[in-house]
Amino acid sequence: NMTERHSDTCGQRHEHAHGKSKIEEALGKYDSAPSDDSVREAVKKIIAEKVQEKDTPEVKKCLMGSIELTTLKTTDSPESVMAFTERVNEFDNTYPDLPHIATVCVYPCFADVVSETLEVDGVEIACVSGSFPSSQAVIEVKVAETALAIKDGATEIDIVMSVGKFLSGDYESVADEIGELKEVCGDRKMKVILETGCLKTAENIKKASILAMYAGADYIKTSTGKLEPAATPEAAYVMCQAIKEYYDKTGIQIGFKPAGGINSV
């Protein structure tokens, strides 16, 4: 249960034993990340052995039904977002043999536009929040933006992990922020973007993945799409291995979302 897990972790996070915080203790329970070289080799092996096998219409339809159709442009306007959403409404007519996309993703100021325009059942409304894409804002601003997005119709929230704090080793502050924003989201799904291109190493990506899941993420996501490199097969491999290990230890299934720079299958 996500709520139980979250309240448990938040309630214990500042207790210390043997000089270690609860976050450090939690991270210590997981395997060390593989080396960057071994990750590259593992990815090469998967691509060589699995890509052709998985190149089927069924897999492609599954991927189509997992897409988060996104507009996060400086030039977005109520009119452009409305037209963007109408494309989703027309999808069945345009592509009758394909599954619907999963989600429409916009800035919080357009949540109400999508909510009022979207006519398709089963398509979620996601908003990036918490000072996307940099996550450089005080927590009160992040909380307010998230709460307002939900009030205006967001059914999912995408936040960005505080990468600077993470790289400085301030894991407790990073986890506290994620936990506080998950409290605002309640039972709505919250994705935590790790911005793996800034983390650079498999070790950092593994640690950030575990930290985000421990703190309350429902999904972990590679990138904002605003920086390069964005999603890579190597980052995806490390994150998915972390999700599997987390599930093996807790029984809690966390989702994975690759984002940024993906333009083919």
Language-model segments: which ranges?
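Structural signal for alpha-helical transmembrane segments and their membrane-water exit/capping regions
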Residues: L69-L72
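Short, hydrophobic beta-strand segments that form beta-sheet elements in well-ordered domains
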Residues: V104-V106
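Short, intrinsically disordered, charge-balanced linker/junction segments flanking boundaries
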Residues: R13, P258-V265
